[in-house]
Regions:
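Interdomain "pre-motor" coupling segment immediately N-terminal to P-loop NTPase/helicase cores
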Residues: 1-20
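Short, low-order "capping/linker" segments at domain edges
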Residues: 23-26, 515-527, 561-566
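Inter-lobe coupling/hinge segments of SF2-like helicase ATPases
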Residues: 25-31, 35, 47-130, 134-487, ...
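Hydrophobic residues on short alpha-helical segments
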Residues: 38-39
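A short interface-forming secondary-structure element
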Residues: 481, 525-534
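Short amphipathic alpha-helices in soluble, non-transmembrane regions
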Residues: 489-495, 535-547
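Short beta-strand elements
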Residues: 500-511, 553-562
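Short proline/glycine-enriched turn/loop segments at secondary-structure junctions
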Residues: 512-515, 549-550
Length: 566
């Protein structure tokens, strides 16, 4: 430098991946059914601001999105593409980046605060991203010329931000954002939420159907296995039925892959004393502890507290402690024992905590480095794998027998979505659905992939019992360490609300889990008819909340509202 041979300069280098130039030649040509759906969407946008794309699994919805994004960019508009899970951004990012290059920005909570700030600043700059792909928080980014919002897998409950506040549903927020900016909204899914489908059926939204899979691939065959009967006849001991074991072996030996779905992580959901029935429970929450064999701890899945595994029952002194039920850890152990030659991976919250774990597990399975993938609901959310020929749903009953008015809807969605991972490009797939209730009407809908029949049954129930989409639902939660205090506070709140809302108020009541992190919980349900003045409702609720806070007896009681709960 002293001799003038080298020059120094300062340049600001951002954390963001700038990518390359967009290359629209890398887009795939739409098939006949896809092109027809694309044309119908564009036509619907002439009359409707929101359109629902109801396309079966593996029908090629993503490719339609890519063509819609291209059209928006060519019209000098920005696009927001929302996904329910960070895991889904892993597979879709490369597909979009190949086409849109540096015009694509990624935004989700796995990024550091500094990275997210840079994306925010870029969106406010003179050269923002044309396309933002992200999870629910991406809906809060600034857009100068938003033209299209795509909400993929719109039925997913993951779009609801629950805790901490602010509580919002990204789908509803996206629709409102589009309305405020003059943009169009496309909701895409194979299993629409009842609310969205009802809006489409009543003409509020446009509706476009894509009823066949890409390149004519058949929907998977679904076989129901009665595990109760198999256990009674002593033909099944572990979590996998003989039929499922045989089909998984056949898939692995034939160079194909299998997915096993168990929506429960850990080794076993319960430890129990054979002599007296004692079950270890969390000291801070009203729940039993889940055994995690990898860490040799019992863990609370609500507060995260970990406890040592007892060797002796503290209630009766017996050493006969055994586990009940099976989580993904136990399934993994049993599968590894049954198929020692197979390469097995597990995908749940425990295995995806570390940075890059999502990507590694998905990439290994997509590239054929894993033969059998065991997982929770993460594996049923729009992931696309070519070699999967067998899917096992190990416990359908746990999804159906849940105390919630959405239980059947959510169970159908989960089973249909997981089933859709089978038989994508290698012929028709097979789904083995294990249950103790083979005659349940819901399972018939799943086998026939008959969303219409499910919708007609559930919508009639919702109307009869005044549930969404025929009412607005609000839950009022009250929390305090002292159960007596929260009981009195909830009764006072309930009485106050009844003076204003009458029989629209239900409760207070104890929720299924009535204590979390040492706080006792009470819940009040508010059912409001459509068309009610929501501004006045908010005014009453805030007045009630303030009245409770001003009362010296209840000043320390936490009160919050969950509007349109999931």
């Amino acid at each position: 430098m002293k001799r003038g041979l080298l020059d120094t300069y300062t340049r600001e280098v951002g954390r963001l991946n700038t990518g390359g130039e967009p290359d629209f030649t890398r887009m795939k040509q739409l098939g006949e059914a896809q092109q027809r759906a694309y044309n119908e969407i564009m036509f619907s946008f002439l009359k409707k601001n929101v359109v629902l794309l109801h396309g079966v699994t593996s029908s090629g919805k993503t490719e339609i999105y890519i063509h819609l994004i291209k059209q928006a960019i060519e019209s000098h508009k920005q696009v927001l593409y929302l996904l329910p899970e960070i895991a889904l951004t892993v597979q879709i990012t490369e597909r979009l980046r190949r086409v849109f290059g540096g015009k694509l920005g990624i935004y989700h909570s796995r990024y550091s605060d500094n990275e997210r700030v840079e994306i925010w600043r870029k969106q406010l700059s003179a050269a923002p991203y044309d396309v933002i792909l992200g999870a629910r928080s991406a809906v809060l980014l600034p857009f100068a010329r938003l033209g299209l919002v795509i909400v993929d897998e719109e039925h997913e409950q993951s779009f609801k931000q629950q805790d901490p506040a602010p509580r919002y549903h990204a789908r509803s927020t996206a629709i409102m954002l589009a309305q405020m900016t003059g943009a169009k909204t496309l909701l895409g899914t194979a299993t629409p939420s009842l609310e969205s489908y009802h809006s489409a059926q009543t003409g509020k939204y446009g509706l476009v159907r894509l009823a066949q899979r890409y390149k004519g691939i058949e929907l998977p065959e679904i076989r129901i296995v009665d595990v109760k009967d198999l256990r009674r006849r002593k033909m099944m001991k572990g979590p996998l039925s003989p039929l499922l074991m045989a089909k998984v072996r056949e898939a692995v030996e034939g160079g194909r892959q299998a997915i096993l779905f168990q929506n429960r992580r850990g080794f076993a959901p319960m430890v129990e004393c054979r002599q007296c029935g004692w079950v270890p429970r969390c000291e801070r929450c009203d729940v039993s502890l889940t055994l995690h064999r990898r860490t040799n701890k019992m863990t609370c899945h609500y507060c995260g507290a970990a406890y040592d595994v007892p060797q002796v029952c503290p209630a009766c002194g017996s050493r006969e402690l055994h586990t009940r039920g099976a989580g993904t850890e136990k399934i993994e152990d049993r599968v590894c024992d049954a198929f020692p030659e197979a390469r097995v991976a597990r995908m749940d919250l425990d295995t995806t905590r570390t940075n890059g774990a999502y990507e590694r597990i998905i990439d290994d399975f997509a590239e054929g480095r894993t033969d059998i993938l065991i997982g929770t609901q993460m594996i049923g959310k729009g992931l696309d794998f070519d070699r999967v020929s067998v899917v096992g749903i190990l416990d359908a009953d746990s999804m159906m027998n849940y105390p919630d008015f959405r239980a059947y809807e959510q169970a159908f969605m989960m089973m249909a979505q997981v089933s859709g991972r089978a038989g994508r490009k290698g012929g028709r797939g097979l789904v083995i659905l294990q249950t103790k209730s083979p005659d349940a009407p819901l399972l018939d809908y799943v086998v026939r992939n008959d969303y219409g029949a499910l919708y007609r049954e559930l919508i009639a129930e919702r109307q009869a019992f005044r549930y969404p989409p025929y009412t607005h639902l609000t839950y009022i939660y009250m929390k305090h360490r002292d159960e007596t205090v929260v009981d009195h506070a909830a009764n006072e709140m309930g009485s106050m609300l009844r003076r204003w809302f009458g029989d629209r108020v239900l409760g207070p009541d104890r929720p299924a889990v009535a204590r979390v992190k040492t706080l006792c919980i009470r819940k009040i349900v508010l059912k409001l008819e459509l068309g009610i003045d929501m501004a006045k409702v908010r005014q009453y609720l805030r007045a009630a909340q303030k009245a409770m806070a001003d009362d010296p007896r209840f000043r320390s009681v936490q009160t919050y509202f969950d509007v349109d709960p999931m």
